[in-house]
Amino acid sequence: MIVGIGIDIIELNRIEKMLDGKLKFMERILTENERNVAKGLKGSRLTEFVAGRFAAKEAYSKAVGTGIGKEVSFLDIEVRNDDRGKPILITSTEHIVHLSISHSKEFAVAQVVLESSSS
């Protein structure tokens, strides 16, 4: 049973501007593992990576119903890729999490669906 749905869209140029103060912004948004992946990226690929993670974390917080804040922070949520490259969301939840991230020339968007883990 679906227990939550969240979606977020972010302008890539907004993230690009925030990356000017790169380290501080990335430390606030990305987990250590995500920052390690980001170190190998440059230019538009780095912007897309960070924007996708930002949107995914915002979408998750909306699906949970709290938004980013006291109950859920950016660092409580990690986005990884499975063996086929599919994004997966790692967090301390009892729910099954479905995540989709997409990019265009100007935007990154993410959608999260939370499913009850009990039948």
Curated annotation (Swiss-Prot):
Binding residues for Mg(2+): 8, 58
Protein name in UniProt: Holo-[acyl-carrier-protein] synthase
Catalytic activity: apo-[ACP] + CoA = holo-[ACP] + adenosine 3',5'-bisphosphate + H(+)
Record carries keyword Transferase: yes
Gene Ontology terms for molecular function: holo-[acyl-carrier-protein] synthase activity; magnesium ion binding
Alphabetized UniProt keyword annotations: Cytoplasm, Fatty acid biosynthesis, Fatty acid metabolism, Lipid biosynthesis, Lipid metabolism, Magnesium, Metal-binding, Transferase
Family: Belongs to the P-Pant transferase superfamily. AcpS family.
Enzyme Commission no: 2.7.8.7
GO cellular component, one term: cytosol
Cofactor(s) demanded: Mg(2+)
PANTHER family: L-AMINOADIPATE-SEMIALDEHYDE DEHYDROGENASE-PHOSPHOPANTETHEINYL TRANSFERASE, PHOSPHOPANTETHEINE TRANSFERASE
Function: Transfers the 4'-phosphopantetheine moiety from coenzyme A to a Ser of acyl-carrier-protein.
Location of the protein in the cell: Cytoplasm
Tagged with keyword Metal-binding: yes
Main location: cytoplasm
Any one biological process term the GO annotation gives: lysine biosynthetic process via aminoadipic acid
UniProt-listed InterPro entries: 4-PPantetheinyl_Trfase_dom, 4-PPantetheinyl_Trfase_dom_sf, ACPS, P-Pant_transferase_sf, Ppantetheine-prot_Trfase_dom
